[in-house]
């Protein structure tokens, strides 16, 4: 098994980490096996990355036969779109390293918890936007093939988890057009 950390540089000078839990293939048992992968996006209100939604989740997926990756994305004081671009890069990295990490590049899912659910849903809904294409990303390479949302922050409207949007947007927290853009419903 491989356990490693890849650094992702944020556009604001921050550093995210992609932590991999990868099952190696055995020459005795299907040495060319490709496994599905899952990118785990912990919650924490864009203030922290919850430990309980990180490695414990990765180990459960690993035990189920997935190559598991945890994104420790940048939180406060980083603001939108830093974490979105970090998740975009993480999805791209998983597919770029599919051979090395024994990943079936057509079966890469994402799971997000709370604010991490917002981040995962956000990438899924904007993966083909011009901003990401202009940054050099192929929409097909960054959009998850499946999405699991666990108690996600979805709306920025009346029922919003205000703390998550305050942390994500900082001074832009009252910008109606930005709030609308980031409201996933």
Regions inferred by a protein language model and the residue ranges of each:
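Alpha/beta-hydrolase superfamily serine-hydrolase fold, recognizing
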Residues: 1-185
């Amino acid at each position: 098994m491989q356990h490693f950390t890849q650094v992702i540089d944020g556009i604001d000078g921050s550093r995210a980490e992609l932590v991999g839990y990868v099952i190696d293939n055995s020459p005795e048992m299907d040495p060319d096996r490709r496994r599905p992968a899952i990118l785990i996006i912990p919650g924490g209100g864009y203030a922290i990355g919850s430990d309980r939604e990180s490695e414990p989740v990765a180990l459960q997926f690993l035990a189920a036969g997935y190559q598991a990756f945890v994104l420790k994305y940048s939180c406060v004081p980083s603001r939108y779109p830093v974490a979105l671009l970090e998740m975009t890069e993480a999805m791209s990295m998983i597919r770029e390293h599919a051979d090395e990490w024994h990943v079936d590049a057509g079966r890469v899912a994402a799971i997000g918890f709370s604010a991490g659910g917002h981040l995962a849903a956000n990438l899924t809904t904007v993966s083909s936007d011009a901003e990401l294409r202009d940054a050099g990303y192929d929409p097909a390479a960054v959009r998850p093939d499946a999405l699991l949302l666990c108690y996600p922050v979805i709306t920025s409207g009346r029922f919003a988890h205000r703390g998550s949007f305050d942390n994500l947007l900082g001074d832009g927290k009252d910008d109606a057009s930005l709030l609308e853009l980031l409201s996933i419903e």
